[in-house]
Amino acid sequence: MRYKTSLVMRKRLRLYRNTLKESSSSSGHHGPQLTAASSPSVFPGLHEEPPQASPSRPLNGLLRLGLPGDMYARPEPFPPGPAARSDALAAAAALHGYGGMNLTVNLAAPHGPGAFFRYMRQPIKQELICKWLAADGTATPSLCSKTFSTMHELVTHVTVEHVGGPEQANHICFWEECPRQGKPFKAKYKLVNHIRVHTGEKPFPCPFPGCGKVFARSENLKIHKRTHTGEKPFRCEFEGCERRFANSSDRKKHSHVHTSDKPYTCKVRGCDKCYTHPSSLRKHMKVHGRSPPPSSGYDSATPSALVSPSSDCGHKSQVASSAAVAARTADLSE
């Protein structure tokens, strides 16, 4: 049986060589222009799909040569050997009339469902626009409006072209609609940190595996890492309290429990509720169907949006706080 198969293959190979000689002598092309209908006897395996193959699979690994099939299907798990590659090149040249150097351009196979996934895999080009108001000698500053494809390019442009070097005496943010409204910073690094609010740059990633959080300031990253390490370096300053906190802001909020100070007051008209902790105020605001303005949990200052100095509750809490501090001072002096 094996001898009979070998004999058949030799006859087909001999027939193929004779066909090449005849076509090359009568045509000036790189290879014979045999159509799929005229050569089934030479390469029957190239035109007959195996029964177990589905339309979404490549045929015999010849997908890369422009043969009909799903051009976006996954490649074979094992690359073909040198003999298979040479046979494939010869077959493609015979079927399409292309030489070996032109096979890369012959990929116009019928588009299958994989074309959609190829489109989805294309990277989405983003444009980052510089909205710095640059003075150009006129009364009204003009918008920079330069576009960049990466965050690094935008940040470098703003830092070098607009913020400037040490020769700049006034560290003012001229970003469009900046809420500081021309109020200068005391140092250049503070201005650079502030600009990240506008650009969205967050150059400080969490180093712990699987976290994935990034931060705009190194101080915030330092505080965040304590959630992984469990470090709580800020101890409550009141005697007898062993509570510890990861940042000074949480410790300050906790201190209101000891002083009876309630600086977080409800801003809704007619409501005089006040609380010692902002979380209690957030729960209360749900009664009104509102939520207090968001504030960073890493700020050491009390959120001004939540404090009402004119409130009676706030005044009473300040009096109670002063009395508690005075009593504690008297105890320590004794």
From Swiss-Prot:
The keyword Metal-binding applies. It comes from Homo sapiens. Residues 20-60, 282-334 are annotated as: Disordered. Its main location: nucleus. SMART domains: ZnF_C2H2 (SM00355). One of its GO terms (biological process) is regulation of transcription by RNA polymerase II. It holds the Pfam family zf_ZIC. InterPro entries: GLI-like (IPR043359), Znf-C2H2_ZIC1-5/GLI1-3-like (IPR056436), Znf_C2H2_sf (IPR036236), Znf_C2H2_type (IPR013087), Znf_ZIC (IPR041643). A zinc finger (C2H2-type) spans 128-162, 171-198, 204-228, 234-258, 264-288. Belongs to the GLI C2H2-type zinc-finger protein family. Coiled coil: none annotated. Residues 297-311 have a biased composition (Polar residues). Keywords: DNA-binding, Metal-binding, Nucleus, Repeat, Zinc, Zinc-finger. Binds to DNA. It is found in: Nucleus. This is Zinc finger protein ZIC 4. It comes from the Eukaryota. GO terms for molecular function: DNA binding; DNA-binding transcription factor activity, RNA polymerase II-specific; RNA polymerase II cis-regulatory region sequence-specific DNA binding; sequence-specific double-stranded DNA binding; zinc ion binding. One of its GO terms (cellular component) is nucleus.
